[in-house]
Amino acid sequence: MIKPRTPPGIMELLPREQIAFQRMLDVIRRNYERFGFLPIETPVFELSDVLLTKSGGETERQVYFVQSTGALANAAAAADEGAENGGLPELALRFDLTVPLARYVAEHEHDLSFPFRRYQMQRVYRGERAQRGRFREFYQCDIDVIGKDALSIRYDAEVLAVIHAVFAELGIGDFKVQLNNRKLLRGFFESLGVAEGELQLAVLREVDKIDKRGADYVRDTLVGEGFGIAAEQVARILAFVALRSEGHADALAQLQALEASVGASATLGEGIAELREVLELVKALGVPERAYCLNFSIARGLDYYTGTVYETTLTDHPQIGSICSGGRYESLASHYTKSRLPGVGISIGLTRLFWQLREAGLIQGIAESSVQAMVALMDETRLDDVLDIARRLRIAGINTEVQMEPKKVGKQFQYAARAGIRFVVLAGDDELARGVVAVKDLVREQQFDVARDELASTLLVELEQAKGDAVRRSWSFLLA
């Protein structure tokens, strides 16, 4: 007999946790749509030569390739005959949602309206080394605004407002969107003589590690043989990236002070101007100033970011790390089209976020179900009545489960409690003879009678009240 088990790097949830995960997905989707983003889905696998526009490297080593049994047999036969392998398998599982988006926009460019505002919430796959908190299959929840030839910096501010709306409704604790601009960093490095090119990109990647590895690590790396930057210059870099703002006015003041002290090179001036405009628009969009700040160490390790960059963290749980990140890029689909398609976007890695929240004790004792009511069956002769009651509840929009076999009432209550069903409807001989049914509220441990024809309307009121209770408890995301 084969032992049932899931592959390493997979998060599989029991129903109660799956409901909580699904509700997080629903909140994210709802807020994306409120800001006018349109849904798309792309295939779980893409053509290998399309997905892997840059051959080799870490990305290709983590890609899962897809091969049919027929193709495998043909490859094996060819190998037996001494033939060379025909190259990579034809298909590969997507490793993020950005590359499929680039292919999608390039392929459908003439059918889309620009700026194209898209959201996508799907699983992606990476051959990560199996270890705690690292996943091979995980959900990403992305938004991007794609322009044609140009895209206003105003969208960068709107994306920050989307981040705020999502995490405010998720209710998982206070959070802060940390904001920076790659042009500002590049301009500052240029003022120190760290010229644009591979060296500057490498320095940016090291600076981005400062919150994880610490200033001493970054200092030793930049002064070391690989970089050879003078200690005095490294000290200025570390002092610069240590800057943080406290409040909206302080953020603007820091930009002004930076402009005066360093001198506005063309690149630095662009970065300051873009950040200043984003800050002003974020205020107009109603994002509270406690929810964002400038953090000059945020660079994002991916080299295609060219302007605004974001990282979001939980204020009281910084050990969780970034829970949402992204930024602006100049050309999304340069490998697939000659059109210039600048954009800005962010991604929420929901699988990892959910796992970390659970590990940190921020999701506790979820006792809810998608089933809103259960109709108990105590007597076989009352099955028709029970089915009719359930049918009427469903017509009223109430998710209703029926016990199809008669059991003792106590056992049916136990089942409902274990399943997280709050309301149990009892329709026994005594109740039906009086034209009523009994409703047991398992949370409040109260039972009351209600006229049979008023059951649906009464339960709708009770469910609305229960929903209000859940909101006051951050709907089951109970903070430690």
From Swiss-Prot:
CDD domains, alphabetized: HisRS-like_core, HisRS_anticodon
A GO biological process held by the record: histidyl-tRNA aminoacylation
EC number: 6.1.1.21
Molecular function GO terms recorded: ATP binding; histidine-tRNA ligase activity
Classification of source organism: Bacteria, Pseudomonadati, Pseudomonadota, Gammaproteobacteria, Lysobacterales
Residues passing through the membrane, by range: none
One GO location term (cellular component): cytoplasm
Sequence similarity: Belongs to the class-II aminoacyl-tRNA synthetase family.
Source domain of life: Bacteria
Subcellular location: Cytoplasm
Keywords (A to Z) from UniProt: Aminoacyl-tRNA synthetase, ATP-binding, Cytoplasm, Ligase, Nucleotide-binding, Protein biosynthesis
InterPro entries for the chain: aa-tRNA-synth_II, aa-tRNA-synth_II/BPL/LPL, Anticodon-bd, Anticodon-bd_dom_sf, His-tRNA-ligase, HisRS-like_core, HisRS/HisZ, HisRS_anticodon
EC primary class: ligase
NCBIfam families for this protein: hisS
Subunit structure: Homodimer.
Name assigned to this protein: Histidine--tRNA ligase
Keyword DNA-binding set for record: no
Main location class: cytoplasm
Catalytic activity: tRNA(His) + L-histidine + ATP = L-histidyl-tRNA(His) + AMP + diphosphate + H(+)
